[in-house]
Structures are given as structure tokens and as C-alpha cells.
Amino acid sequence: MGKVRTKIVKRTARELLEKYPNLFTRDFEHNKKVVSKLIETKSKKLRNQIAGYITHLVGIKLKRQIQA
């Protein structure tokens, strides 16, 4: 089964991607650093979940661009 992400993770990731679309890449480590600069998270786990979901969304976006 896949990983379940909470609303806060999905909402925050989508908001960050909308505001700063050019800051994120398919590299998780890079996205993790960018997320930590943009928002203050209460825990590393939450920061990593947001960065991971952003990485996932960027990958989907790139695949769609290639297919189009």
C-alpha cells in the first residue's frame, strides 16, 4: 500500500508550489533545504513529508510536460 499524507502536508506543498514554482526540483535534498527556508516546521518529519510530496508533484508535472 502507498503512503498516506495528511491534509496539512498536501495543502502546504501545493501552496508552496503555487507561490514558488521555480524553486523546486526533482531532488529531495534540495527541496528539503528550500522548504526549511520558506516555512518554520515544528518537526523534521513534517518538513521531510512536505518536501517529499513536493518532489512527487514536480515529478508528475515534468512527466506531463514530456507527454504533451
UniProtKB/Swiss-Prot annotation:
Gene Ontology cellular component terms for the protein in this record: ribonucleoprotein complex; ribosome
SUPFAM superfamilies: Rps17e-like (SSF116820)
One Pfam family hit: Ribosomal_S17e
One of the record's GO molecular function terms: structural constituent of ribosome
Top-rank taxon, per record: Archaea
Keywords linked to the UniProt accession: Ribonucleoprotein, Ribosomal protein
GO biological process terms held by the UniProt record: translation
Similarity comment text for this entry: Belongs to the eukaryotic ribosomal protein eS17 family.
Protein name: Small ribosomal subunit protein eS17
Organism whose genome encodes this protein: Staphylothermus marinus (strain ATCC 43588 / DSM 3639 / JCM 9404 / F1)
Gene that specifies this protein: rps17e
